[in-house]
């Protein structure tokens, strides 16, 4: 589906941080040492709940910002919201395309 829609997907190790605050630069460095390619506050709780219910799961996460300490500017919730809004049509199309093939 992603190829048909000319979307770039990446596979990697996702490390969950519970939030609600952004991860710190030190946590990001530790996650990198432990092999994480991305960090975030979503996907994992939903996957745990679904697995607990006996569902088969596929985790797909939109990485909406660079992790703390990667770029010189501080993280911003506004930045995350803007990226999510910009990506929503493509992300929705990807998910709907996958669901149509089940």
Regions found by a protein language model. Give the residues of each.
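Glycine-rich phosphate- or other oxyanion-binding loops that anchor nucleotides, phosphorylated ligands
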Residues: 1-62, 66, 78-102
């Amino acid at each position: 589906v992603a190829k048909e829609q000319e979307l770039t997907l990446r596979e990697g190790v996702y490390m969950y941080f519970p939030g609600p605050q952004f991860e710190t630069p030190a946590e990001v460095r530790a996650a990198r040492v432990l092999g994480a390619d991305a960090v975030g506050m979503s996907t994992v709780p939903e996957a745990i709940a679904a697995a607990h219910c006996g569902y088969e799961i596929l985790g797909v996460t939109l990485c909406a910002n660079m992790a703390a300490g990667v770029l010189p500017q501080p993280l911003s919730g506004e930045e995350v919201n803007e990226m999510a809004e910009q990506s929503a049509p493509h992300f929705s199309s990807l998910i709907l395309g996958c669901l149509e093939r089940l």
